[in-house]
């Protein structure tokens, strides 16, 4: 399986993937602070982790899953929040997204949850193939610092 846990030496690649994903989604101004991201992923108190997909023989990172733990009080167990899933366009349709999600699924007996932008019909079809379902009746809120 070409999926592995990211290491501190991967920070430039991780940030590049996030920035590429932002451009893909139409946001061209995102530039991440590598030092801040390193602290959050690999510091004394990590807040998230990243899985990287590296196809055999490709010699490059093709995609990633950016995750953190969450907790379901109703299930009484931890799950995984998938904040970002991105496979570079030239590596799509080769099973890497499926392998990244399978690696997440293997890490928890709880739920794996994520958001997606409305209108992404390719993603809807992909997630349905996996057996994932939209959560009807819930609205996501965001409370940003002032």
Where are these regions (language model features)?
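A short beta-loop-alpha structural element at the N-terminal edge
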Residues: 2-16
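Conserved GNAT-fold acetyl-CoA-binding loop/helix
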Residues: 15-40
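A short helix-loop-beta-strand connector motif used in the catalytic cores of GNAT acetyltransferases and
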Residues: 40-52, 81
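Conserved beta-strand in the GNAT
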Residues: 52, 60-69, 81
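A conserved beta-turn-beta hairpin within the catalytic core of GNAT-like acetyltransferases
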Residues: 71-82, 92, 110, 136
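Conserved glycine-rich acetyl-CoA-binding loop
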Residues: 75, 88-102, 118-125
